[in-house]
């Protein structure tokens, strides 16, 4: 799969249009001080335990951690918090806080679409 061509991510029955964090600046800043509307931001990594923060965030966010095309962990964070994923992950999807029951999506299949 060519990473730059990913336009959508499907998590179970949910579908997200994504902005790919495909360079150092986008990965470093993520959603800090910006609003990408209803889209989500997708981060791709080599398999590891991902640590992140919500410093300078303008709003709470939901974060979905993905490994082997399955949701392995999901969390809702307010601004000015830190979090380290307890599971190994190869991708992270972050988006504005929603009404999704994050516990319900653990284990859901994830599809990366063009």
Swiss-Prot record:
Transmembrane segments: none
Domain of life where this protein originates: Archaea
A Pfam family: DUF192
Stated family: Belongs to the UPF0127 family.
Full protein name: UPF0127 protein MJ1496
Lineage of the species this protein comes from: Archaea, Methanobacteriati, Methanobacteriota, Methanomada group, Methanococci
């Amino acid at each position: 799969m060519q990473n730059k061509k990913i336009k959508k991510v499907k998590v179970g029955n949910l579908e997200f249009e994504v902005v790919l964090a495909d360079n150092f600046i986008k990965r470093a800043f993520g959603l800090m001080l910006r609003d990408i509307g209803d889209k989500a931001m997708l981060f791709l990594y080599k398999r590891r335990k991902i640590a992140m923060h919500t410093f300078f965030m303008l709003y709470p966010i939901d974060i979905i951690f993905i490994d082997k095309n399955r949701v392995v962990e999901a969390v809702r964070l307010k601004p000015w918090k830190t979090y380290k994923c307890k599971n190994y992950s190869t991708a992270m999807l972050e988006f504005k806080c929603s009404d999704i029951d994050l516990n319900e999506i653990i284990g859901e299949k994830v599809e990366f679409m063009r």
